């Protein structure tokens, strides 16, 4: 896959369009990113009638699509036990749109 080469504003930033990339260092501590991860847990709880409690964001990856697909590894508490889950959230910030695409136990 090619880097953005023409007027997309991404040239020289190392962003690979369409490819899943590790987010910049420290992104797991970014408040907006944490809110998206909390959203993923809340959406999963609502859909699955679960009671997972967000603990922390462990890993963040992202993919530039029509918006941004965020790939999270999230530590949660379930009945007092800490567990890891993987979530995928699609966001189009300019439309105030976010949607949980996937939420599953980490492999």
Swiss-Prot record:
In its UniProt record, a GO molecular function of this protein is: cysteine-type endopeptidase inhibitor activity
> Is the keyword Cytoplasm assigned to this protein?
no
This protein's species is Hordeum vulgare (Barley)
Q: Where are the transmembrane segments?
A: none
Phenotype when changing residue 38 to G: Decreased cystatin activity, but no effect on anti-fungal activity
Site (Reactive site): which residue positions?
18
- Entry comment describing in which tissues the protein is expressed: Expressed in embryos, developing endosperms, leaves, roots, flowers and pollen grains.
Which Cys pairs does UniProt list as disulfide-bonded? none
Protein's UniProt name:
Cysteine proteinase inhibitor
Which keywords has UniProt assigned to this entry?
Answer: Plant defense, Protease inhibitor, Thiol protease inhibitor
What single Pfam family name could you report for this chain, choosing any that match? SQAPI
Top-rank lineage group of the source organism: Eukaryota
Q: What induces it?
A: Up-regulated by dark and cold shock, anaerobiosis and upon seed imbibition. Repressed by gibberellic acid treatment in aleurones, but not in leaves. Not affected by abscisic acid treatment.
Q: What is the effect of changing residue 63 to L/P?
A: Decreased cystatin activity, but no effect on anti-fungal activity
Q: What does this protein do?
A: Inhibits papain, ficin, cathepsin B and, to a lesser extent, chymopapain, but is inactive against bromelain. Inhibits the growth of pathogenic fungi. Regulated by the DOF transcription factors SAD (activator) and BPBF (repressor).
Domain (Cystatin): give its ranges. Answer: 18-107
Motif window: Secondary area of contact: 63-67
| Entry similarity comment | Belongs to the cystatin family. Phytocystatin subfamily.
Which biological process annotations from GO are given for this protein?
defense response
